[in-house]
Amino acid sequence: MNTNYSDNNHITLVGEVTSEKRFSHEIYGEKFYIFDLSIPRLSGNADNIPITISERLLPENELPIDSKISVEGQFRSYNSYQGEKNRLILTVFAKEITFIENQEEEIPVGKDITTNEVVLDGYICKKPIYRKTPFGREIADILLAVNRSYNKSDYIPCIAWGRNAKFCETVPVGAEIRVIGRVQSREYEKKHEDGTIEKRIAYEVSVSSLEIIDKNTDENEEAVQENQEAI
């Protein structure tokens, strides 16, 4: 595993601020806030991603709604304990923020324009789950453990499609892989034991390319390249 943790986990987002910043936590006198960023898709829809940011990155501690910004950082996870239950919370941890020069222009969207890209280098935590949708599309669910400084790890859910999904069936638990994709938000319904239904939002990486990291096996690298597929 690459011990340069910035290379293990890097994300670039360009979008529009859609919420007021909310206080999250404080560490050694440094306050952190959360806000929501809307990133447009080619389809015309948008992904709404939570961003965690230090007060030290905000000019005059201001972050107006509708501001258009770019964010460089990492896609991270942490556990939220509610009674006896545990939930995996995902957020983008901002390391750099830039206000777009022309705030009046719409955020451009195109295949050659990077507005949502994440690169992760991690380990397969459990056997990928391969399945087909009712429409016959191949999907594989992957849980990736990405090492971070101070002996921490981020557990990132990923979705592979098509040939990448089929290929994941053969990837063993513990394999080190590198994925490139985008972070997406997805609404779903959680049914509780008492029959009530709660609407939730899941955050995950939609994988556009995937490769096994094995410097000693050229055969693996060739096989993975054959399985690279655009979103």
Label each region the model flagged:
Residues M1-I231:
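Single-stranded nucleic acid-binding surfaces, predominantly the OB-fold ssDNA-binding core
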